[in-house]
């Protein structure tokens, strides 16, 4: 791997220590991407942490503050050279318009399950592309079906520079066969119609909690 994503956000000081320790362990040639999941809460905590982490050389910092505090993201972006990414702060086109108008971020993390599916995700990516904001297709630990949809969106726009669709790799049992397409650290989709996923109905029935037949 040439990059790592780290989840932090419980305590700023301990987060700083963990990130520095990881940098020491992996060396200087591996990209470190930090996802705070809103845990640093505000711009003051975030800027303090970024100052302490200046020597680490972060690839980007994801959603350090509360989701709806777009103004805090504006402040952070204006006071650091570390690229910042909005995740929880974007769910729909209205959010994207505000982000673009305020120039609040360098990157956005688009999640199909959060924004409403394939078409809304492509729409958000198109808006970001016009504003020069790079995109990532994010994961909510979905099955092969959801992950395949995300990969197809990712391949549709050049502005989508990264993906984190690893849900199928984390499941003991998955209803689809996308796992066969992972060629770590790459993904190689097939040429089958639709999403290219074959649903295993036996596994589907094993995982179902209830079913209804509509005639």
Label the model's feature ranges.
Residues 18, 142, 164, 199, ...:
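Short amphipathic alpha-helical leader/targeting segments
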Residues 11, 118-119, 140, 196-198:
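Gly/Ser/Thr-rich beta-alpha loop segments that engage phosphate groups in nucleotides
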Residues 169-170, 174-215:
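C-terminal extensions of enzymes
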Residues 1-80:
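Metal-dependent enolase-superfamily TIM-barrel catalytic cores that perform enediolate-based chemistry
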């Amino acid at each position: 791997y040439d990059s790592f994503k780290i989840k932090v956000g419980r305590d700023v000081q301990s987060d700083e220590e963990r990130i520095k320790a990881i940098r020491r362990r992996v060396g200087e040639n591996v990209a470190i991407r930090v996802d705070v999941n809103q845990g640093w809460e505000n711009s003051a905590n975030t800027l303090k942490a970024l100052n302490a982490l200046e020597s680490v050389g972060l690839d980007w910092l994801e959603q350090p503050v509360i989701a709806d505090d777009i103004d805090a993201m504006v402040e952070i972006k204006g006071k650091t050279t570390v690229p910042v990414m909005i995740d929880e702060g974007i769910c729909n086109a209205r959010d994207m318009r505000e982000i673009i108008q305020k120039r609040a971020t360098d990157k956005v993390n688009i999640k199909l399950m959060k924004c409403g599916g394939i078409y809304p995700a492509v729409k958000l990516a198109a808006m970001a592309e016009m504003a020069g904001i790079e995109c990532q297709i994010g994961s909510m630990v979905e099955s092969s079906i959801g992950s395949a949809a995300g990969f197809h969106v990712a391949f549709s726009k050049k502005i989508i520079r990264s993906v984190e669709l690893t849900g199928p790799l984390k499941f003991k049992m998955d209803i689809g066969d996308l796992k066969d397409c992972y060629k770590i650290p790459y993904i190689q989709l097939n040429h089958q119609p639709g999403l290219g996923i074959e649903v295993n109905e036996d596994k589907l029935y094993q995982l179902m909690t209830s079913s209804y037949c509509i005639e």
